[in-house]
Amino acid sequence: MDPLKAQQLAAELEVEMMADMYNRMTGACHKKCVPPHYKEAELSKGESVCLDRCVSKYLDIHERMGKKLTELSLQDEELMKKMQQGVTST
């Protein structure tokens, strides 16, 4: 595959993943913090605080999971290299 096309595909996938994360986060936080039948157009103080905390926690967990998955992926790559070296040296 052409490196430019690969880079473009990776960028498109990243945008799609970020949009998916945003949609899931807003849906989950809205469901948790805003009652299904509301009478006011503006958020109440409690709803606003709840949404702020929910989004903050969601992003924090997303970042932690990303770091952990990257760490595990690197460990897997190192293990595969060691296994391949063991196979080629025998």
UniProtKB/Swiss-Prot annotation:
Q: What does the UniProt entry say about where the protein is found?
A: Mitochondrion inner membrane
Q: Which GO terms describe its biological process?
A: protein insertion into mitochondrial inner membrane
Amino-acid biosynthesis in keyword set: no
What are the GO MF terms of this UniProt record?
A: metal ion binding
Q: Which Gene3D superfamilies match?
A: Mitochondrial import inner membrane translocase subunit tim13 like domains (1.10.287.810)
What keywords sit in the KW lines? Chaperone, Disulfide bond, Membrane, Metal-binding, Mitochondrion, Mitochondrion inner membrane, Protein transport, Translocation, Transport, Zinc
Specify the domain of life of the species encoding this protein.
Eukaryota
Purpose: Mitochondrial intermembrane chaperone that participates in the import and insertion of multi-pass transmembrane proteins into the mitochondrial inner membrane. May also be required for the transfer of beta-barrel precursors from the TOM complex to the sorting and assembly machinery (SAM complex) of the outer membrane. Acts as a chaperone-like protein that protects the hydrophobic precursors from aggregation and guide them through the mitochondrial intermembrane space.
How are the domains described in the entry? The twin CX3C motif contains 4 conserved Cys residues that form 2 disulfide bonds in the mitochondrial intermembrane space. However, during the transit of TIMM10 from cytoplasm into mitochondrion, the Cys residues probably coordinate zinc, thereby preventing folding and allowing its transfer across mitochondrial outer membrane.
User: What family, per the record?
Assistant: Belongs to the small Tim family.
Q: What is this protein called?
A: Mitochondrial import inner membrane translocase subunit Tim10-B
